[in-house]
Amino acid sequence: MTAHDADWSDRDVSGALVPGEGDIDVSLRPRSLREFIGQPRVREQLQLVIEGAKNRGGTPDHILLSGPPGLGKTSLAMIIAAELGSSLRVTSGPALERAGDLAAMLSNLVEHDVLFIDEIHRIARPAEEMLYLAMEDFRVDVVVGKGPGATSIPLEVAPFTLVGATTRSGALTGPLRDRFGFTAHMDFYEPAELQQVLARSAGILGIELGAEAAEEIARRSRGTPRIANRLLRRVRDFAEVRADGVITRDVAKAALAVYDVDELGLDRLDRAVLTALTRSFGGGPVGVSTLAVAVGEEAATVEEVCEPFLVRAGMVARTPRGRVATAQAWTHLGMVPPAGAAGLGQPGLFD
């Protein structure tokens, strides 16, 4: 691992799941739709899908959950299985490299099981094509042998519900997307919703969290429950070591300053991207690959981890010619925006 990798690999404000925190995250997961905070529209729709299937005594349509990481897609998959009283089988798109990998998993399903495929947009094409038939007709054709002597053997699959999760719904092929009977897009959380998430998590973890402190952490959590819970744990560490264990607003502010999370929830990598965009490229436009090289990161990391929040926060604008720093980005970095900065003189355009 390089020094640079050490800097960014454990970002507290990344929506990605950090190794070693899985057990804690499991304890904080809601176990029913009633416990799930936020996403009211999605919850209502899922409730109808689940109750309708239970009333008919059948399996629900296949379900696709899309949205940025850390919003609760995996939790909802677990809840769907629990609400149906079914077993949950879990895998991921990258793990299904061959059709045989998927066939083995499908053959072990029993009726009404829920199969959860995370990052389904990354499933290999042979496995995806096998999935088409399994989703529609609950059977798969397994090819035995090679060349002219190859034989296709049909295998029945127990009726099941597929729950797919993706952070890039546009990367799904049309045939796969069309086979989902219900699609839900999950939105970023409002600060008030994140305060509820933090209050619930604090209760489970036995943390004394003041209302003002919860508001402070929620405001810097980038609209993402996973980040809110992660920051809560880091602030707890600070409170136990450098304070009396009680998390007040001042303690939360001091802790978040130590972890380089600023008032808007930006961390060092976010600020590095903005700094490169403004100082090295004069505000842009600049391509994401060039921008990634400037900060020493992979283009995918900049595009999938940093950029969504920076765009949503009104700091970066995506244009046909590349990424452009808005007037708000210049101001946030303590610089005077140039006359041509995006959004300058257009109040509310990026609010």
Swiss-Prot record:
Catalysed reaction equations from the record: ATP + H2O = ADP + phosphate + H(+)
Any one GO biological process: DNA repair
Molecular function, one GO term: ATP binding
Keyword Membrane: no
Classification via InterPro entries: AAA+_ATPase, AAA_lid_4, DNA_helicase_Holl-junc_RuvB, P-loop_NTPase, RuvB-like_N, RuvB_C, WH-like_DNA-bd_sf, WH_DNA-bd_sf
Positions of region (Head domain (RuvB-H)): 263-351
Pfam families referenced in this protein's UniProt entry, alphabetically: AAA_lid_4, RuvB_C, RuvB_N
Binding site for DNA: R318, R323
Location in the cell: Cytoplasm
Binding site for ATP: L28, R29, G70, K73, T74, S75, E136, D137, F138, R179, Y189, R226
Quaternary context: Homohexamer. Forms an RuvA(8)-RuvB(12)-Holliday junction (HJ) complex. HJ DNA is sandwiched between 2 RuvA tetramers; dsDNA enters through RuvA and exits via RuvB. An RuvB hexamer assembles on each DNA strand where it exits the tetramer. Each RuvB hexamer is contacted by two RuvA subunits (via domain III) on 2 adjacent RuvB subunits; this complex drives branch migration. In the full resolvosome a probable DNA-RuvA(4)-RuvB(12)-RuvC(2) complex forms which resolves the HJ.
UniProt similarity note: Belongs to the RuvB family.
Domain notes: Has 3 domains, the large (RuvB-L) and small ATPase (RuvB-S) domains and the C-terminal head (RuvB-H) domain. The head domain binds DNA, while the ATPase domains jointly bind ATP, ADP or are empty depending on the state of the subunit in the translocation cycle. During a single DNA translocation step the structure of each domain remains the same, but their relative positions change.
Designated name of the protein: Holliday junction branch migration complex subunit RuvB
Taxonomic source organism: Mycolicibacterium paratuberculosis (strain ATCC BAA-968 / K-10)
